[in-house]
């Protein structure tokens, strides 16, 4: 995250960091150039697509919480964005209109190409933990409302009995040493008729297979919580050539008791294995 202290030194540091970031995005990852190539389905195009998407991307990276606050007073943003945007800064209505029309598949492809560059530049050549590239996988809720919904929303009953609509996805990203990179995200799908909405395990298996196909090899070890202690999920990881570390919380489970018994007998205390040129002990 870039510094944003309300001091002269903080402002200067923010400007320098932002300028360096933008230079790197343009020269190495070609992100501004790719943004200009996105499809634009708007009827009125008084503000160029780039002048809308680029500020949105920057404010997401700066972790600003509310687009409405930012784009309601675009004049105040012009000086901050003068290094990357020429021309008008959009208002919130223009941002909302464009984002509702952009094809998510095009954004996903830009992200996938960015991962390709990271791999080609061997960003993770030293690994993220102990020489291995470790990636965590978990579910995250993105949005919820009792009033607004779309055909792709999941649904549930809240505490008052009202139907609540929400979006949830499974995300896979590196853990350990920086940079922390999101490899991919898989949206969970709503139920069809009497069927239940998709769970995190179904989405996780689909995401792992997709990442294996698109970015193989993308990681050495997958880290997950107890939800993913599931034979079909573990078998999916094995099929994709991945090791796994899964947290086990319930001490009453037979698996936990068996492991504890082995440690008491001094079995399984240490085991080493090789993967390619790497060696690891557990």
Where are the regions that the model predicts?
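Gly/serine-rich nucleotide phosphate-binding loop at the start of the catalytic core
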Residues: 1-4, 14-90, 96
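Short, contiguous clusters of charged residues that form electrostatic/catalytic patches at enzyme active sites
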Residues: 53, 167-170, 202-209
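Short alpha-helical segments and helix-capping/turn motifs at coil-helix boundaries
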Residues: 54-57, 117-124, 231
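Short, conserved catalytic/metal-binding motifs centered on acidic residues
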Residues: 55-56, 70, 91, 95, ...
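Active-site-proximal, Lys/Arg-enriched surface segment
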Residues: 96-178
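A general structural motif
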Residues: 129-132, 167, 180, 214-219, ...
